[in-house]
Design a protein with these regions (language model features):
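NAD(P)H-binding glycine-rich loop region in Rossmannoid oxidoreductase-like domains
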Residues: 3-4, 45-100, 197
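N-terminal Rossmann NAD(P)H-binding glycine-rich loop of SDR-like oxidoreductase domains
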Residues: 2-23
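Residues at the starts of beta-strands that form the adenosine-phosphate
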Residues: 2, 26-28, 104-105, 140
Length: 223
């Protein structure tokens, strides 16, 4: 596998980068980002680009799998148009350019409840992204749909941290069909994405509880 990764400067993307570089079936990882990715692994090649401008990175799209780990929050990006550009336009632009360059597989982080018809701005943007990338016609196309993501972020997000703490308190009560809404850790998402790239899955859209199962399988394979 030759991987292309966008979003490597984020929490989940950074973990996925390390997993990809450590795996014997991955011959190389190319990261495309606005900021420099601090990783000197011999299998890693990083490029600082404008992800909304294909001319700045199309020549670097040489690989088999595209991993999309980009995203933002409404707290960080209050402007709705800019928010939509990051959640929808950016991943779609990169995916379309990657397909034109011969990349056959895409695995993108979306969100649980993503739908073009959602009344929530976040889920609607992710739903539009899923719909439009799926329509491009990749040979393999997967959207991972995590619930609320845990982990420790470098930037301060007090409101998000509050909701994570509340969610952790009620997680044990979420059983049955509610189990998929439990918090999921970024390393779990990253491990599941690696497993999907290596083995595929029966569904295009993979919800949070299934991601935990796939991550466990990937960890078992590493033993």
């Amino acid at each position: 596998m030759q991987a292309i990764l966008i979003g490597a400067t984020g929490l989940t993307g950074g973990i996925l980068l390390e997993l990809l570089l450590a795996h014997e079936q991955v011959v190389g990882v190319i990261t495309l980002s606005r900021k420099r990715v601090q990783n000197k692994h011999p299998k890693h090649t990083g490029h600082e680009v404008d992800l909304l401008d294909p001319a700045s990175y199309s020549e670097h799209l040489k690989g088999t799998h595209l991993f999309i780990c980009t995203g933002t929050t409404q707290a960080k990006t209050a402007d709705k148009q800019e928010y939509y550009r990051i959640e929808h336009d950016l991943p779609l632009t990169v995916a379309q350019t990657a397909l034109e360059k011969g990349i056959g597989a895409v695995i993108a982080i979306s969100a649980l409840g993503a739908s073009p018809d959602s009344s929530f701005v976040y889920n609607r943007g992710k739903g539009d992204m899923e719909r439009d990338i799926a329509a491009l016609g990749f040979k393999q196309c997967y959207f991972v749909q995590p619930a609320l993501i845990g982990g420790n972020r470098s930037e301060s997000r007090p409101v998000e941290r509050f909701f994570i703490n509340v969610q952790r308190a009620i997680d044990p009560l979420m059983v049955g069909f509610l189990k998929k809404y439990r918090i999921i850790e970024p390393d779990t998402i990253a491990a599941a994405m690696l497993y999907i790239a290596l083995h595929g899955d029966k569904d295009m859209r993979i919800e949070s509880d299934r991601l935990k199962e796939l991550a466990a399988l990937q960890e078992k394979n590493n033993l």
